[in-house]
A protein has these predicted regions:
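Patatin-like phospholipase
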Residues: 1-42, 50-279
């Protein structure tokens, strides 16, 4: 079984609907009462990490699979009714407030730390947020962390425009080390050896034209992500970190809606966690 001490961190990558893999991992951790003194999540990793921190086993799976099938909160339907491809009003207000209540009390009473990552649209840099008591601000932060560029409107935290933290820090391993945690368990949503295209990502001239540093960050996104993957694999080989990831390329897209594919990926996450942690 995994040996956790006061210097051990849990790092959660995002990946949109690929995050159901992480849901499986976190449910395994909760089933075995495995807790970390510090965790950090990006985008879907932030969403699922919140349910882990409030000890709500199964909440991530229910939100990402069962309620997706019922409410169809991704795709053309929310695009027509709202301002993006994802119904954020449903996800970040109706779900935690009424449909799938979030246990803010349990989260506030959890002595362990949890940070969420966003991208500052003005500076083009990562922001790291730690909030346990202001319920409105918690939602603002996790919503911003999960606001995919192009697919969602900008979100605001303390009046500052923010987008998905994965733009600049998809795998915040170095952040965990900077915070003093030199033992990390990293949960990825891509298989070993995966790399994005090395070409710079073109950003249409009419998009985010008032945010030049954000545009630079978007163009360099693939390069930064590949560098983070290389660091993860190098440190894994050196025995510095433990990595839980899909064993083979997955067929689930960032905005996947297939219940079967999502359920299979959730189960894969649970089994991968069991295999890695139990050896």
């Amino acid at each position: 079984m995994l040996n956790i001490d006061e210097k051990t961190a849990l790092v959660l990558e995002g990946g949109g609907m690929r995050g159901v893999f992480t849901c499986g991992v976190l449910d395994y951790l909760m089933d075995h009462k495995i807790r970390f003194p510090y965790a950090i999540g990006v985008s879907a990793g932030a969403c699922n990490g919140l349910s882990y921190m409030s000890h709500q086993r199964g909440r991530g799976k229910f939100s990402n699979i069962d309620l997706l099938a019922k409410y169809k909160y991704i795709g053309i339907r929310p695009l027509v009714k709202k301002r993006g491809l994802i119904d954020q009003q449903l996800l970040f207000h109706r779900f935690p407030d009424r449909i799938l209540p979030y246990n803010y009390k349990a989260y506030a009473e959890n002595p362990n730390r949890f940070e969420m990552v966003t991208t500052d649209c003005i500076t083009g840099r990562a922001c790291y947020w730690e909030e346990k008591h202001d319920e409105k601000r918690i939602i603002e932060i996790v919503k911003a962390s999960s606001s995919l560029p192009y697919a969602c409107p900008m979100s605001y935290v303390d009046g500052h425009p923010m987008l998905d933290g994965g733009i600049v820090d998809s795998i915040p391993l170095l952040r965990a080390y900077e915070q003093g945690y030199d033992k990390c368990v990293v949960v990825l949503t891509r298989n070993k050896g995966y790399r994005k295209s090395t070409k710079k990502v073109p950003v249409p001239s009419f998009i985010y034209k008032q945010y030049p540093r954000l545009r630079v960050a978007l163009r360099n996104r693939n390069k930064i992500y590949n560098e983070q993957l290389e660091l993860v694999e190098r440190w894994e080989e050196e025995g510095k970190i433990i990595v839980i990831r899909p064993e083979k390329p997955i067929v689930v897209g960032r905005m996947e809606t297939s219940v079967k594919k999502l359920t299979d990926l959730y189960n894969q996450g649970y089994e991968c966690a069991k295999k890695v942690i139990e050896g």
